[in-house]
Amino acid sequence: MEIKNKTRIGHVISDKMEKTIVVGIDVVKRHPLYKKTYRRTMKYLVHDEKNEAKIGDMIEIVECRPISKGKYWRLSKIITKGHIVAAQEA
């Protein structure tokens, strides 16, 4: 019996740590009583061995063994590269 790991698609929010990125995944939920839909962003710490993902990239992550206290995901592939707009200093 083959065990298939969970995969998610999200965008990179932060890449300031060494070999770690923060990925945001938007989840749309419906309130059980009022039936209103609302959006939540779930944040995951993801292991990026080669430091290849940058802010704004759309990536696929896959579940893996625990790498640290909060890292249970690793980078599978980069789907699209993001465009970073640098803020101009006045």
Curated annotation (Swiss-Prot):
GO biological process, one term: translation
Record's GO cellular component terms: cytosolic small ribosomal subunit
SUPFAM superfamilies: Nucleic acid-binding proteins
Residues in coiled coil: none
Keywords, ordered alphabetically: Ribonucleoprotein, Ribosomal protein, RNA-binding, rRNA-binding
GO molecular-function term, one example from the UniProt record: structural constituent of ribosome
InterPro entries hit by this protein: NA-bd_OB-fold, Ribosomal_uS17, Ribosomal_uS17_bact/chlr, Ribosomal_uS17_CS
Record-linked Gene3D superfamilies: Nucleic acid-binding proteins (2.40.50.140)
Function: One of the primary rRNA binding proteins, it binds specifically to the 5'-end of 16S ribosomal RNA.
Subunit organization: Part of the 30S ribosomal subunit.
Family label: Belongs to the universal ribosomal protein uS17 family.
UniProt-listed PANTHER family: 40S RIBOSOMAL PROTEIN S11 FAMILY MEMBER (PTHR10744), SMALL RIBOSOMAL SUBUNIT PROTEIN US17M (PTHR10744:SF1)
Name of the molecule in the record: Small ribosomal subunit protein uS17
Gene this chain is encoded by: rpsQ
